[in-house]
Design a protein with these regions (language model features):
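Domain-edge interaction signal
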Residues: 1-100
Length: 100
């Protein structure tokens, strides 16, 4: 079952020490989605659809959630986002992406 977009975004932001910008988050989310799909027969990590924008892939719902922060750091604006259990295999992909 795919995770909620906000849950993955919160996990990545938190794992990155809340230092990522909108542009960085979009790219990390895209990488996580593509890596996860590649390893899991096309099953998505999270529900969402990316679009090709001038500066790279963008998930519009996520963009509108964090666009007010411009190129600055995104604080914890993901209310209602669920966490991931320690043994959740989706964490491996998100952890790997955050190391890049």
């Amino acid at each position: 079952m795919a995770a909620r977009l906000e849950s993955v975004a919160k996990y990545i932001c938190k794992k990155s020490g809340w230092t990522v910008s909108n542009l960085q988050l979009q790219k990390l989310m895209y990488l996580a989605q593509m890596i996860y799909m590649g390893r899991n027969n096309g099953k998505p990590l999270f529900d969402g659809t990316f679009q090709a924008w001038d500066y790279g892939p963008v998930e519009p719902n996520l963009y509108h959630t964090v666009k007010g922060y411009g190129s600055g750091r995104i604080p914890d604006v993901f209310s209602g986002a669920l966490g991931f259990e320690e043994d959740d295999p989706r964490r491996k992909v998100m952890d790997d992406v955050c190391k890049r």
